[in-house]
């Protein structure tokens, strides 16, 4: 089970759950998703961030502010930004690179590599995954292409018994696009300047 912490009244989500974190620009949705990852790190869980808008160094810097012992955190970042900016980089234990936010095939491969490493080499049972952001994917590809990719990606999260947190800018897309993508997720966290509301799947106590 995945504990969401006191901000969510200590609600828990079943392994394999995918949640859409939706809100307008500057509403704090990215930070909320990072905080949910950090809450898992505090309990010894793994964290994987697929970033299509910020470099891995920025993600790491922001994440380190949210955890008490950054050196002990098991985190992996799939960076789809740095190579796209023309910089020459190689994969490390912490960061793997895709060519651009359009390179969804490589994005999926690198993500799967991290899941395999976390499970087999580090012995991590629980993994929280953050994708930031679906809106960037939609800047480079049409909604049908993104839907197909995310259908596969969310299935991988489900098969890995991980928890998926997928960030999107709600005001950047029309209702049809939002409704199409929402079909892929088990729950939604709507973030606004005033806070957030969550529609999450209930968990059977027998689980």
Predicted regions and their residues:
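Loop/turn-to-beta-strand initiation segments
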Residues: 46, 74, 125-128, 159-167
């Amino acid at each position: 089970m995945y504990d969401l912490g006191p901000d969510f009244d200590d609600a828990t989500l079943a392994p394999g759950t995918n949640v859409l974190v939706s809100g307008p620009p500057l509403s704090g949705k990215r930070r909320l998703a990072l905080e949910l990852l950090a809450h898992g790190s505090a309990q010894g869980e793994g964290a994987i961030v697929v970033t299509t808008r910020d470099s891995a160094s920025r993600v790491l810097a922001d994440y380190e502010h949210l955890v008490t012992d950054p050196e002990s955190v098991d985190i992996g970042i799939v960076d789809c930004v740095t190579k796209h900016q023309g910089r020459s980089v190689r994969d490390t234990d912490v960061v793997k690179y895709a060519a651009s936010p359009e390179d969804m095939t490589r994005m999926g491969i690198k993500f799967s590599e991290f899941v395999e490493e976390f499970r087999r080499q580090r012995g991590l049972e629980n993994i929280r995954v953050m994708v930031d952001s679906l809106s960037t994917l939609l800047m480079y590809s049409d909604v049908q292409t993104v839907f197909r990719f995310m259908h596969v990606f969310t299935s991988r999260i489900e098969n890995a018994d991980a928890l998926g947190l997928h960030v999107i800018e709600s005001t950047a897309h029309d209702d049809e696009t939002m409704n199409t993508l929402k079909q892929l997720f088990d729950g939604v966290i709507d973030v606004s300047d005033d806070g957030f509301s969550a529609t999450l799947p209930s968990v059977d106590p027998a689980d």
